[in-house]
Amino acid sequence: MVLSEEARDLLADLPMHRRQTFELRLQQWGPDLLDAVTALYASPDEVASALVTIAARGFAARSDELHRLDERRLLQPDWFQRPNMFGYACYVDRYASTLKGMGDRLDHLTDLGVTYLHMMPLLKPRPGDNDGGYAVMDFSSVREDLGTNEDLAELATTLRSRGISSVVDLVLNHVAREHDWAVAARAGDAKYRDYFLIYPERDTPDRFERTLPEVFPDFAPGSFTEVDGEWVWTTFNEWQWDLNWANPAVLLEFAEIVVHLANLGIEVLRLDAIAFLWKRLGTNCQNQPEVHAVTQALRATCRLTAPATLFKAEAIVGPRDLMPYLGEGRHAGRVSDIAYHNSLMVHVWSMLASGSTDLARHALAGLPPTPPGGTWVTYVRCHDDIGWAIDDSDASARGVTGVGHRQFLADWYSGEFDGSWAEGLVFQHNKETGDRRISGTAAALTGLGPSRKDVAGGFARIFLAHAVVAAWGGIPVVWSGDEIGSPGDSDWASEDGHSADNRWVHRPRMTDSDRARRFEQGSDAQRVFDGIALIARVRAGLPMLHSEAPTRVLTDADIDDGLLVVQRRHPSGTFVGVFNVTGEHRPLARARLTDLGSGDPREVLSGHDLAEHGLDDPDGMLWVPPYAAWWIV
């Protein structure tokens, strides 16, 4: 590709080395950009030229400090894959009221070991109910109650000075109906009507809906909303209008938004609802091939302006559909850098409820490794409900049914199953499929909920769950409140706009007093916080937990069903994770550790002396304590 005249003019006043830098980037990423738009649009050269112009404008406006950040990241392309990466996710208003307040309350995070901070939707949403901030009416402005764009840029700079990368949501699939584009479309502006999917009659929506699943069957059934006698595509809620990504003007608009956020200093953009972007009749309109071409076009544009900014795909999809979001085939190394390991999260909860690792071993061992330049976000809880994404074929391969196991998990974590320690809430019961998702904090789902059904077990399960996800490589992310053992917000329904959405139970506000409780010896907050901080601290010193080292899940029949055993090989040595998901001692053959490369094994996480657990016993059997998490090197 060559620079357009307009792009040359935008770069003309820059120093020679800057102009040369942009031209070198165009040589590197220009072919990716052109390839992507060629797969999408009828006039690819025109679209590609417009994207390069957007990138050049952003490059010329980018600050010197951010240009230096770009150079540092290009010299350390694996910076986000290193074992010192440890994440935290929160709503700014619920953690610190404002962006300035966030900057004043970072000690809590640095003490935890955080190097990656995901601040939940903070761009201006519609007033009233807004899906937790995911119904955006202005992508160019921060929520007024949180602060200003300048406050966000200042916070991003402060975070960088403390070794923390900032992460912000970018909702790609839809906008609020109050967004200027939607307002203009509703007023009849032909240009903006083509930004959306609007049908004059019901026939086409009916044909689509034959194969479309419902996202919110309880309070937003269907995928279309009648507006002024026409039908608008609204996958999530009637006030969230799906965008028409087949229109290149939408791509250009979002390229401008990506560059704007990158120039505020945001280091990771979480691409929300990315799986839903492209619509195709006769499908579920998720995971369509064009989604990856759209991502590639946006990523290439961003790399021209701000290669320090990464993409994270929020694709909560089945395990077989997940890997393309990190890049496969023609898109390898060209789409998102990070994706959510939803399957790992689901199977952690499945193992704890069932006391069995059999299904998890089979499912997790069957996933291909991440591409060399990609990594996972691993997590125990997040802002959302838990959907029981148990693959039917995985379940049947292990002698159970997917429907039956999903039913069991919903029963267990809602507390309906006899003997359950959990106190979750059922979210979105789909009466047609029987699926029931679950809301609740980590504490509420492990025995430390309001009724404190199993205090000792709860502490052990919280530590174990976080130790598992932190041992998988990638970026483990802790959900706000879970690090202090919050049982949840008992008054979640009393806030305006929250009463119909029980996910707010696991989105509690955190006060300075709440944070201070971690200093009270023996408190829930102290015990949970210190445990998770220990995980982060030990992890940072283990090169075997670099993302490029693959995780091997052992599926051998001679390994006890209550133990999950994983191995990670790295030039610096071998890591073996041993996790007991039961409340009983479980045996592990000493020879297993030798076979896995641990000739002189040391447990470095929990402080367990393996000799006290049978390391040297004549029978050659180690006994792993209840809910133990062993990191062995």
Indicate where each model-derived feature is located.
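Active-site and adjacent substrate-binding regions of carbohydrate-active enzymes
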Residues: 1-633
